[in-house]
């Protein structure tokens, strides 16, 4: 399996996606389900396919993804990051275009932790003057 497949690992928020690509017809499978079934929102599907549209490889590769953790938005971002890394593993000349679009850089934004004495990360308890 390793010989014919190129792989990449993508991360976003608390989601991790392991992506495997090989020459094929453009079928994307996420956790043994079609991408249309796995992601309900069209926006998430578009986010996943962005690197393929940018490099004109929409119907060139069959993509198999294992993703876990986080929610729909984080998983879509993790899949996009993983597909980008797998494309670079397949053809390193694609890296400048993908990097220019900002797909190579891992989005480092994480949820800020809740602080003691606050209701959430930054929201304080209501102040009562009297």
Curated annotation (Swiss-Prot):
Swiss-Prot/TrEMBL keywords: Ribonucleoprotein, Ribosomal protein
SUPFAM superfamilies: Ribosomal protein S5 domain 2-like (SSF54211)
Record-annotated disulphide pairs: none
GO CC terms of this entry: cytosolic small ribosomal subunit
Domain of life: Bacteria
The keyword Transferase is assigned to this record: no
Keyword Ribonucleoprotein among record annotations: yes
Residue spans crossing the bilayer: none
One Pfam family of this chain: Ribosomal_S9
GO molecular function: RNA binding; structural constituent of ribosome
Any one of the GO BP annotations: translation
PANTHER family attached to this UniProt entry: RIBOSOMAL PROTEIN S9, SMALL RIBOSOMAL SUBUNIT PROTEIN US9M
Family: Belongs to the universal ribosomal protein uS9 family.
Protein name (database record): Small ribosomal subunit protein uS9
């Amino acid at each position: 399996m390793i010989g014919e497949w190129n792989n990449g690992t993508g991360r976003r928020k608390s989601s991790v996606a392991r992506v495997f690509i090989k020459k094929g017809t453009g079928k994307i499978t996420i956790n043994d389900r079609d991408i249309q079934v796995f992601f309900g929102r069209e926006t998430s599907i578009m986010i996943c396919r962005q690197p393929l549209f940018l490099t004109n490889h929409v119907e060139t590769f069959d993509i198999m993804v294992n993703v876990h953790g986080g929610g729909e938005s984080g998983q879509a971002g993790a899949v996009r990051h993983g597909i980008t890394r797998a494309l670079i593993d397949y053809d390193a000349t694609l890296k400048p275009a993908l990097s220019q679009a900002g797909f190579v850089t891992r989005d480092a934004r994480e949820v800020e932790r809740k602080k003691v004495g606050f209701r959430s990360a930054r929201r304080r308890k209501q102040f009562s003057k009297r």
